[in-house]
Amino acid sequence: MIDDDGYRPNVGIVICNRQGQVMWARRYGQHSWQFPQGGINPGESAEQAMYRELFEEVGLSRKDVRILASTRNWLRYKLPKRLVRWDTKPVCIGQKQKWFLLQLMSADAEINMQTSSTPEFDGWRWVSYWYPVRQVVSFKRDVYRRVMKEFASVVMALQDNTPKPQNSPAYRRKRG
């Protein structure tokens, strides 16, 4: 399903943990990393597509996450000319994306990249919040920057609410 401007509707998923780190996934058989994302099927809402992609790509279900936020607007990126499939109709020149910020509520062990016969990813790791903006493929960088900027206050508030261990330098004990 491609819109009149040549953009394929898509969802992007940022999964964070309680420490404010985000899940960074390695594309299957490649050296490139990105957030989970995928197309919206006809008749499917963006949220329904997000849950479907979440399971297909990283093996998580509704019970494993909670939605913290979604982008206010659709964000677009154009594919480099070398990646456009000019011989298919209609021609897709890029993606328009609705992004979701999720908090992982279950254990890391629930993440499973092998739920599909053709997995999208073959590895993952937790990275610092802004790391993906510098590391993603260049044609997605502006969208990633905008997504992370929009979600930053939510993730930082989540971090601020995480209990600090007593031996942490951030923990201050009142002196009598």
Swiss-Prot record:
Chain span(s) of sequence motif Nudix box: 38-59
Keyword Protease: no
GO-annotated cellular components: cytoplasm
Domain Nudix hydrolase: 6-149
Keyword match Hydrolase: yes
InterPro entries for the chain: Nudix_hydrolase, NUDIX_hydrolase-like_dom_sf, NUDIX_hydrolase_CS, NUDIX_hydrolase_dom, RppH
Pfam families linked: NUDIX
UniProt keyword annotations, A-Z: Hydrolase
Root EC class: hydrolase
PROSITE patterns: NUDIX, NUDIX_BOX
E.C. designation(s): 3.6.1.-
Gene Ontology MF terms in the entry: mRNA 5'-diphosphatase activity
SUPFAM superfamilies: Nudix
Cofactor: a divalent metal cation
Any GO BP annotation: mRNA catabolic process
Classification via PANTHER family: M7GPPPN-MRNA HYDROLASE
Family: Belongs to the Nudix hydrolase family. RppH subfamily.
Its biological purpose: Accelerates the degradation of transcripts by removing pyrophosphate from the 5'-end of triphosphorylated RNA, leading to a more labile monophosphorylated state that can stimulate subsequent ribonuclease cleavage.
Name used for this protein in its record: RNA pyrophosphohydrolase
Organism: Escherichia fergusonii (strain ATCC 35469 / DSM 13698 / CCUG 18766 / IAM 14443 / JCM 21226 / LMG 7866 / NBRC 102419 / NCTC 12128 / CDC 0568-73)
